[in-house]
Curated annotation (Swiss-Prot):
<dbReference type="GO" id="GO:0003723">
    <property type="term" value="F:RNA binding"/>
</dbReference>
<keyword id="KW-0694">RNA-binding</keyword>
<dbReference type="InterPro" id="IPR039157">
    <property type="entry name" value="RBM18_RRM"/>
</dbReference>
<dbReference type="Pfam" id="PF00076">
    <property type="entry name" value="RRM_1"/>
</dbReference>
<protein>
    <recommendedName>
        <fullName>Probable RNA-binding protein 18</fullName>
    </recommendedName>
</protein>
<dbReference type="InterPro" id="IPR012677">
    <property type="entry name" value="Nucleotide-bd_a/b_plait_sf"/>
</dbReference>
<dbReference type="InterPro" id="IPR035979">
    <property type="entry name" value="RBD_domain_sf"/>
</dbReference>
<feature type="domain" description="RRM">
    <location>
        <begin position="25"/>
        <end position="106"/>
    </location>
</feature>
<dbReference type="InterPro" id="IPR000504">
    <property type="entry name" value="RRM_dom"/>
</dbReference>
Amino acid sequence: MEHNTNMLPLENASILSEGSLQDGHRLWIGNVDPKITEYHLLKLLQKFGKVKQFDFLFHKSGPLEGQPRGYCFVNFETKAEAERAIHCLNGKMALSKKLVVRWAHAQIKRYDNCKNEKVLPISLEPSSSTEPTQSTLSVSAKIKAIEAKLKMMAENPDPLLPGQSSYSYFKANEKKKCTPYHKSSLKSKR
């Protein structure tokens, strides 16, 4: 059975055609076995050309902190090197998993223009009015309102705060009993 190396599998051909839309030569490598080290993966990638940048990602927090995320990014010097890495590595077994190699896509940043002015709901109760409510206030306006209320509360302390019962379990004027039992009564029962 003769194998033609010039023929690309249909899957790899579609991946390579996506590369013409990409700026740079950055690849995403996914489905990486957790036992593969950063060093071994880098050495494997260097066989396909000069690696300009290599980002092997780890969990930063949570129960998996310090463990690999299972994917990485690599930048090659030329597009031909990146295409060769896709052709050779995509679908290949690496320990117990098949590698997935694709062109990396730029992260689209959404809501950047709204970052400073977040809208937070003040109440969970539905409003029956059609006029704009306080829920469209900016975060800074809400902070100022809370600070003003705290200042007002500090200036006019209320003896009975909301939520505080007049029948409080802990009253300052009540004395606690130090010894609820007498030693003599315990000895006589033995």
